[in-house]
């Protein structure tokens, strides 16, 4: 298992609330919690930025982290990430924040300590560009959105 440096920014982490951890042996994501001062109600259509109480330093340029929504919040309550996906670069060391967007027509209350998103580590390949005049032909070619069909 890869070791990632984690800084606790809120003393409730590790005391009232656990460190992010994998729920099962097969889990890909670690749950991030809302570490606000008090419960926060998100109005329909509103976007709020919520602290998680931690920062991480990945340090390895072959890794990044993504902050992804929790499926139940989106499906059952209309709560999704305001930026859809949060990308954490390997050299970022600041606090992890979660942008929550209430896309429903009902207010939603985030309680202190609620699991609001998940953190997933992903491999990164940094690429350079080779300028060409033409590409070798493929079956798909320039076919764009919907070109490959539905089934």
Swiss-Prot record:
Swiss-Prot/TrEMBL cofactor(s): Mg(2+)
Membrane-crossing residue ranges in chain numbering: none
Entry-linked CDD domains: trimeric_dUTPase
EC code: 3.6.1.23
Keywords per UniProt: Hydrolase, Magnesium, Metal-binding, Nucleotide metabolism
Cross-referenced SUPFAM superfamilies: dUTPase-like
GO terms of molecular function: dUTP diphosphatase activity; magnesium ion binding
GO BP: any one term: dUMP biosynthetic process
UniProt cross-references to Pfam families, sorted A to Z: dUTPase
Reaction(s) catalysed (UniProt annotation): dUTP + H2O = dUMP + diphosphate + H(+)
Classification via InterPro entries: dUTPase, dUTPase-like, dUTPase-like_sf, dUTPase_trimeric
Residues annotated to bind substrate: 70-72, 83, 87-89, 97
Keyword Magnesium listed: yes
Pathway where this protein functions: Pyrimidine metabolism; dUMP biosynthesis; dUMP from dCTP (dUTP route): step 2/2
Entry superkingdom: Bacteria
Keyword Glycosyltransferase found: no
Listed HAMAP family: dUTPase_bact
Similarity remark: Belongs to the dUTPase family.
Function: This enzyme is involved in nucleotide metabolism: it produces dUMP, the immediate precursor of thymidine nucleotides and it decreases the intracellular concentration of dUTP so that uracil cannot be incorporated into DNA.
The name this protein goes by in its record: Deoxyuridine 5'-triphosphate nucleotidohydrolase
Organism the protein comes from: Actinobacillus pleuropneumoniae serotype 3 (strain JL03)
């Amino acid at each position: 298992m890869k070791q990632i440096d984690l800084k606790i920014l809120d003393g409730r982490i590790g005391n009232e609330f656990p460190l992010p951890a994998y729920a099962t042996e097969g889990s890909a994501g670690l749950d991030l919690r809302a570490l606000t001062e008090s419960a926060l109600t998100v109005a329909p259509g509103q976007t709020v930025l919520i602290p998680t109480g931690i920062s991480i330093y990945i340090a390895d340029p072959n890794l990044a982290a993504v902050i992804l929504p929790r499926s139940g919040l989106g499906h059952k309550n209309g709560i999704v990430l305001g930026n859809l996906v949060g990308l954490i670069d390997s050299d970022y060391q600041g606090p992890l924040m979660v942008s929550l967007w209430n896309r429903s027509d009902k207010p939603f209350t985030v309680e202190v300590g609620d699991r609001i998103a998940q953190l997933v580590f992903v491999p990164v390949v940094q690429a350079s560009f080779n300028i060409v005049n033409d590409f070798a032909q493929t079956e798909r070619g320039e076919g764009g959105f919907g070109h490959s069909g539905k089934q």
